[in-house]
């Protein structure tokens, strides 16, 4: 991916606030959230809609969202019909994979300017049944599309939470260690919110209700005042035989939100007199055993950092998606990461995990955090249901 003297750069990055399940953003169609962030990143980059070559978004729970929701989001943002738009599906990694695909398209010369990102409204995900051939007798069971299409491992037919329990057991991550990761995430997110660290990256979403328009611009999911004592009282959710360690508090949530970035070559940014947020140095993806899908970022990060010609010690900040605290602890342990460099403003346990959006959300947060603290090198990475990981290295300056 390293493009030498004319690398692919990111010139703008924004996200919506993250809504709780059935919360502030639950009534907003997913393509409208996509439209909101596309409009914002184009405006920040001073790029006219007709100058865009392509739009690529990660989106996982597409059932009932209408034909090609990314195309709907693109057109809604004023991008003309002549500009193609499409979505990619890599579960939790979708939003970052979309950015990788955009960078590839530009590096290959197929595109000049690409808007990439991700979006998800988990609150609107429907329940499903198959009635195509009719039902002669009896009840018709409904399947939750969040579970069957997003959170259930297709190879072992169990919930992602069980994969976290598998990681906790194999990497010897105790319940207390998981709760400490979760409390740290919540406390960091609380501090970041109160200090205004997310203000620059968030674009408000206008939500219609009987009371009129409401502006949603603050992440809804964090639980301020979180502490170990309260968290320790929760019972394990996925294994209830006395061996479980994963609880609702040390796992990420089900959430709604969208994020986007604008990419172009460095020379194009210079021509437009734009100062890039960062250049994309490398990216990588890897596969692991699906039963321990959460450790996918370990090989992905190692490979991406090696491609960049860096060592792990060279990296100033990591944004690694907190699908589960057990997973976060195992990754940090295996890679020997300094906790002061990882998710310094909290992660998905506190902020939430809108499936298709999270990959780009963590990249947006990484870019703005690097800028705020004066860091140079950053890594964004996610584990992926089904046993995969994806990682990207970016560099400022």
UniProtKB/Swiss-Prot annotation:
Pfam families in UniProt: Thiolase_C (PF02803), Thiolase_N (PF00108)
Domain of life: Eukaryota
Keywords: Acetylation, Acyltransferase, Cytoplasm, Transferase
Cystine crosslinks: none
GO biological process, one term: positive regulation of intestinal cholesterol absorption
Site (Increases nucleophilicity of active site Cys): 353
Stored PROSITE patterns: THIOLASE_2, THIOLASE_3
Residues bound to CoA: 223, 226, 252
PTM annotation (N-acetylmethionine): residues: 1
EC primary class: transferase
EC number(s) stated in the UniProt entry for this protein: 2.3.1.9
CDD domains cross-referenced by the UniProt entry: thiolase (cd00751)
Active site (catalytic residues): 92, 383
One Gene Ontology term, aspect cellular component: mitochondrion
N6-acetyllysine carried by residues: 200, 233, 235
Catalytic activity as recorded in UniProt: 2 acetyl-CoA = acetoacetyl-CoA + CoA
Pathway stated in the Swiss-Prot or TrEMBL entry: Lipid metabolism; fatty acid metabolism
MF terms (GO), sorted A to Z: acetyl-CoA C-acetyltransferase activity
Family as reported in the entry's similarity comment: Belongs to the thiolase-like superfamily. Thiolase family.
General function of this protein: Involved in the biosynthetic pathway of cholesterol.
Subunit organization: Homotetramer.
Protein name from the UniProt record: Acetyl-CoA acetyltransferase, cytosolic
Source organism (scientific name): Mus musculus
